[in-house]
């Protein structure tokens, strides 16, 4: 009997069929590192599934399946290859759980396994998801990475995602980091005519982090 196929393994992972995933990994442990044509490992595919999206799913949130993959050696921080323009962003399994799966129980599980939350902040901002953003911030991510030249706090200000913007301000994200056009979060907040309370908080945070702006001659 030959080794199980990549197709069978990935299908089991996407179906959250944790028992089949476990059995297939016993038969072919090297499958845990296999990639599909887009560079996804089975862990990425499992994390991208949305709960309730398929009546054939074998469990409610994929945690048993993801546990089986991690216990077999799947890389928690493995990133799917992306365009260089993405900058600091990495499409990790946690990002797939946040952005594609919208699967909060799995997000919490991955964070407990010490997944790096830094790359998922933009996804939380996109949906202005306070619950996910709060969970990510608890793990003390790097708040000042840039994707397409935008930090999460700049992105939140530009998109007018006020709930997550307020959370990033409270967490101490640096509002002075500029985008490729030379604009910082305070500049874009003014351009977007965000509430004065938000503007004041951004000004206060910038002053706290960097001191007063130099006076013009």
Tell what function each PLM region has:
Residues 1-45, 132-145:
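N-terminal segments that cap or nucleate solenoid repeat domains
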Residues 2-9, 34-52, 79-96, 116-126, ...:
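Ankyrin-repeat boundary/"N-cap" motif
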Residues 30-33, 73-77, 114-116, 140-144, ...:
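The conserved C-terminal loop/turn that links adjacent ankyrin repeats
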């Amino acid at each position: 009997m030959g080794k199980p196929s990549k197709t069978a393994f990935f299908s089991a992972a996407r179906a959250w069929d944790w028992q089949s995933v476990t059995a297939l990994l016993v038969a072919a442990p090297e499958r845990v590192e296999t990639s599909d044509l887009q560079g996804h490992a089975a862990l990425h595919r499992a994390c991208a599934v949305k709960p309730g999206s398929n009546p054939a799913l074998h469990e409610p949130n994929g945690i048993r399946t993801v546990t089986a993959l991690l216990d077999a050696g799947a890389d928690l921080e493995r990133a799917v290859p992306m365009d260089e323009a993405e900058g600091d962003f990495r499409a990790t399994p946690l990002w797939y759980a946040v952005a594609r799966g919208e699967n909060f129980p799995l997000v919490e599980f991955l964070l407990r396994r010490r997944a790096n939350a830094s790359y998922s902040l933009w996804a939380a901002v996109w949906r202005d998801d306070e619950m996910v953003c709060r969970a990510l911030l608890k793990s003390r991510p790097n708040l000042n990475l840039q994707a397409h030249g935008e930090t999460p706090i700049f992105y939140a200000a530009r998109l007018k995602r006020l709930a997550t913007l307020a959370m990033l301000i409270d967490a101490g994200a640096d509002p002075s980091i500029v985008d490729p056009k030379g604009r910082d979060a305070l500049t874009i907040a003014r351009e977007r005519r965000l509430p004065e309370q938000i503007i004041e908080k951004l000004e206060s945070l910038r002053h706290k982090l960097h001191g007063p702006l130099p006076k013009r001659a």
